[in-house]
């Protein structure tokens, strides 16, 4: 580019006018912003949200205290304590998930041999203080009991890919 061409480009502000033209074109196009609480976008069927512990149909909890989920968790967000029952089966006495540490990777769900721990489609939960995001076994079982139909439907829909 010669010096004369550079002078005319600078003198007539062509770069500035190109930028203004681009801005003007996008000013009158439809916006892509979603007003979240009022408008909701579709959630992927494989979305990983709030955790839940499931039970069998007879009401017994599924977790066999194998501690695979605790071992595989990269964020070390899961804490499990167990004891042996009279019939020589292990069950959990403590199953805690710290959601402030959890990265929602889904490894706990993949490693569970009995599909006890699952990640639901729930994304709207909050805590006013740090302790509110520390889920105990009872809280996780309550989530599982409340949303069992949705969890079972999601598992059935995803069975082909597992």
UniProtKB/Swiss-Prot annotation:
Top EC class of this enzyme: translocase
Matching InterPro entries: 4Fe4S_Fe-S-bd, 4Fe4S_Fe_S_CS, NADH_quinone_OxRdtase_chainI
Record-listed [4Fe-4S] cluster 1 binding positions: 63, 66, 69, 112
Annotated positions binding [4Fe-4S] cluster 2: 73, 102, 105, 108
PANTHER family in UniProt: NADH DEHYDROGENASE [UBIQUINONE] IRON-SULFUR PROTEIN 8, MITOCHONDRIAL (PTHR10849:SF20), NADH DEHYDROGENASE UBIQUINONE IRON-SULFUR PROTEIN 8, MITOCHONDRIAL (PTHR10849)
Family listed: Belongs to the complex I 23 kDa subunit family.
Designated name of the protein: NADH-quinone oxidoreductase subunit I
Species classification: Bacteria, Pseudomonadati, Pseudomonadota, Betaproteobacteria, Burkholderiales
